[in-house]
Amino acid sequence: MAATGDALTPQGYIQHHLTNLSVGEGFWTWHIDSLLFSVGLGVLFLWIFRSVGKKATTGVPGKLQCLIEMIVEFVDASVKETFHGRNPVIAPLALTIFVWVFMMNFMDMIPVDWLPSLALLAGVEYLKVVPTTDVNITFSLAIGVFVLIIYYSIKVKGVSGFVKELTLQPFNHWAMIPVNLLLESVTLIAKPISLALRLFGNLYAGELIFILIALMYSANWAMATLGVGLQLGWLIFHILVITLQAFIFMMLTIVYLSMAHEDH
């Protein structure tokens, strides 16, 4: 697919598919496609769950209701096993994270040329359809979790308790306060960074592999045939990847918030 109607080189093809539809420059650049798809999928998630919740019956449930109930029960069981405090927000938060991240990841299942080609017909030169291949989106999610970690740490332990946790662990001596503060600060900051980069790295790599496989179709019939097999194999494997990454993001969020609720 070409952005301007001319044939793209392999390098140009890859670069084109990895470029966001954006406005602004530098720090103030807005990735319009990532924002639209992430918000749109979030609204779709809310609409589906709200519709199923309103139509839920005690009789024989439909297929969609069964699926939703399975997801809710799975997330609820995960929260009960992992979160040791009492907070009615955690289970809905975990459900939202798991389903929303999975839906954003699932956009990677759409063949790489389909939506960008349609966008090109509408005059849109660039379009990335997988929000979690944008590090800005994954960091936004992780920063939201980080804010909750800080909030509940202070709410449960108090300001003084939170400060003591940062300055008197792991070495409980006033002389070791600078060392403790450094170690605990690094540990605290590493949580959102690891959350964001793990999700971004796995999905970005998966998207890149799909793009490389798509290049094989423009070579010759033998490479195109091989590409079909590779694409099918990677598609099956990638279903596991996108599900696992959504699960890991959810579980780490629960673990971090459980740690924030521990009052030493």
UniProtKB/Swiss-Prot annotation:
Keywords: ATP synthesis, Cell inner membrane, Cell membrane, CF(0), Hydrogen ion transport, Ion transport, Membrane, Transmembrane, Transmembrane helix, Transport. SUPFAM superfamilies: F1F0 ATP synthase subunit A. GO terms for biological process: proton motive force-driven plasma membrane ATP synthesis. Coiled coil: none annotated. GO terms for cellular component: plasma membrane; proton-transporting ATP synthase complex. It is found in: Cell inner membrane. It comes from the Bacteria. The chain crosses the membrane at residues 29-49, 90-110, 111-131, 134-154, 177-197, 208-228, 235-255. It is a multi-pass membrane protein. The keyword Transmembrane applies. The keyword Membrane applies. Its main location: membrane. PANTHER family: ATP SYNTHASE SUBUNIT A, CHLOROPLASTIC (PTHR42823:SF3). Key component of the proton channel; it plays a direct role in the translocation of protons across the membrane. NCBIfam families: ATP_synt_6_or_A, PRK05815.1-1. F-type ATPases have 2 components, CF(1) - the catalytic core - and CF(0) - the membrane proton channel. CF(1) has five subunits: alpha(3), beta(3), gamma(1), delta(1), epsilon(1). CF(0) has three main subunits: a(1), b(2) and c(9-12). The alpha and beta chains form an alternating ring which encloses part of the gamma chain. CF(1) is attached to CF(0) by a central stalk formed by the gamma and epsilon chains, while a peripheral stalk is formed by the delta and b chains. This is ATP synthase subunit a. The gene is atpB.
